[in-house]
Amino acid sequence: MGQVLPLVTRQGDRIAIVSGLRTPFARQATAFHGIPAVDLGKMVVGELLARSEIPAEVIEQLVFGQVVQMPEAPNIAREIVLGTGMNVHTDAYSVSRACATSFQAVANVAESLMAGTIRAGIAGGADSSSVLPIGVSKKLARVLVDFNKARIMRQRLKLFSRLRLRDLMPVPPAVAEYSTGLRMGDTAEQMAKTYGITREQQDALAHRSHQRAAQAWSDGKLKEEVMTAFIPPYKQPLVEDNNIRGNSSLADYAKLRPAFDRKHGTVTAANSTPLTDGAAAVILMTESRAKELGLVPLGYLRSYAFTAIDVWQDMLLGPAWSTPLALERAGLTMSDLTLIDMHEAFAAQTLANIQLLGSERFARDVLGRAHATGEVDDSKFNVLGGSIAYGHPFAATGARMITQTLHELRRRGGGFGLVTACAAGGLGAAMVLEAE
């Protein structure tokens, strides 16, 4: 066991997570069509504060993330402060770590708490796949800049005469890695082939995810942590996530064609997480501050770890790399965990990470560790379903997982929970949570 790194303030206070909330998650171009991420962020933070009844001046910092950023609101965190009635003096800044963005936001607030610069803060993220920054071609962008510099009309007309029809076509946001040109689905396909993960295994995991998420909603387990969203024109509120397929059968998954490798692939739209809109946030504070305010924390942040690996192959193995670090820093092993919640970007990626967490060879030859991190107990794993069912608003997923895991730990009488995710750019994140 390596060095344990306790997450405590200088006064010995633990980092308490006192509350968490999210919007329902909606598939792209459905219930939240036309609602930008900044408005989703305002929606969830405003409701989170209202439900917590914490005075606005208690919150000293807000760290928020958005992966698909809009040029008109580059600092989503500050816009949320200004748009929710929070104290205008609240420090606010934005972060981005791809799919692990709200993990990063939580870590940043925790570090401020440990440094003693604040005693309470909010962390979270929001993304919209329905309101996208549609760009212009590089040639048109250059002409537009030169157009503003030109002094006479003749110069301006000459600039536009250089353009061709193709230069005027809108440019959608990139879906591939900037450094490699590979789509995440391409990497998921590569990992499925490398680690021998079959189409049947992927479909079975996806089906399990939807079944468990549907059951969680049916049992009322998500009611406290998901707000009702009222959206223009205010005719039909969104109460639940609208991606969950509660009535599907395993045979339904087999009907879909591969989405990336059309000839020989196994990754489909059904065993991958969909493009999604939504927001999520949590309130963190020092343990003593929570006691002063008479608040009972949902739980505590025990440890966290971020890792980075190569992007050309196995880019989505973040959980297999970050989990042993987070456990080591918490002074725990896999067997100590009550719950494990892993982000399901793709069923193939999820199954590959599960496989390698239990691999002695991977631990020895790749991680340089003496023993495997540990086998993943299916009875502890994604017990309420995962991102394949709920959806994945990139910057919101981490805060969803943290809130969901803490609530489930409390229902089970406490214990330790691991939340972990892969992210674009070969990044990985893992956090160990504790509930009493």
Curated annotation (Swiss-Prot):
<comment type="similarity">
    <text>Belongs to the thiolase-like superfamily. Thiolase family.</text>
</comment>
<keyword id="KW-0012">Acyltransferase</keyword>
<keyword id="KW-0443">Lipid metabolism</keyword>
<dbReference type="InterPro" id="IPR002155">
    <property type="entry name" value="Thiolase"/>
</dbReference>
<dbReference type="InterPro" id="IPR020613">
    <property type="entry name" value="Thiolase_CS"/>
</dbReference>
<comment type="pathway">
    <text>Lipid metabolism; fatty acid beta-oxidation.</text>
</comment>
<protein>
    <recommendedName>
        <fullName>3-ketoacyl-CoA thiolase</fullName>
        <ecNumber>2.3.1.16</ecNumber>
    </recommendedName>
</protein>
<keyword id="KW-0276">Fatty acid metabolism</keyword>
<comment type="subunit">
    <text>Heterotetramer of two alpha chains (FadJ) and two beta chains (FadI).</text>
</comment>
<dbReference type="InterPro" id="IPR020617">
    <property type="entry name" value="Thiolase_C"/>
</dbReference>
<dbReference type="GO" id="GO:0005829">
    <property type="term" value="C:cytosol"/>
</dbReference>
<feature type="active site" description="Proton acceptor">
    <location>
        <position position="422"/>
    </location>
</feature>
<comment type="function">
    <text>Catalyzes the final step of fatty acid oxidation in which acetyl-CoA is released and the CoA ester of a fatty acid two carbons shorter is formed.</text>
</comment>
<keyword id="KW-0442">Lipid degradation</keyword>
<dbReference type="GO" id="GO:0003988">
    <property type="term" value="F:acetyl-CoA C-acyltransferase activity"/>
</dbReference>
<dbReference type="InterPro" id="IPR020616">
    <property type="entry name" value="Thiolase_N"/>
</dbReference>
<dbReference type="InterPro" id="IPR016039">
    <property type="entry name" value="Thiolase-like"/>
</dbReference>
<feature type="active site" description="Acyl-thioester intermediate">
    <location>
        <position position="99"/>
    </location>
</feature>
<dbReference type="Pfam" id="PF02803">
    <property type="entry name" value="Thiolase_C"/>
</dbReference>
<dbReference type="Pfam" id="PF00108">
    <property type="entry name" value="Thiolase_N"/>
</dbReference>
<keyword id="KW-0808">Transferase</keyword>
<dbReference type="InterPro" id="IPR020615">
    <property type="entry name" value="Thiolase_acyl_enz_int_AS"/>
</dbReference>
<dbReference type="GO" id="GO:0006635">
    <property type="term" value="P:fatty acid beta-oxidation"/>
</dbReference>
<dbReference type="InterPro" id="IPR012806">
    <property type="entry name" value="Ac-CoA_C-AcTrfase_FadI"/>
</dbReference>
<feature type="active site" description="Proton acceptor">
    <location>
        <position position="392"/>
    </location>
</feature>
<keyword id="KW-0963">Cytoplasm</keyword>
<dbReference type="InterPro" id="IPR020610">
    <property type="entry name" value="Thiolase_AS"/>
</dbReference>
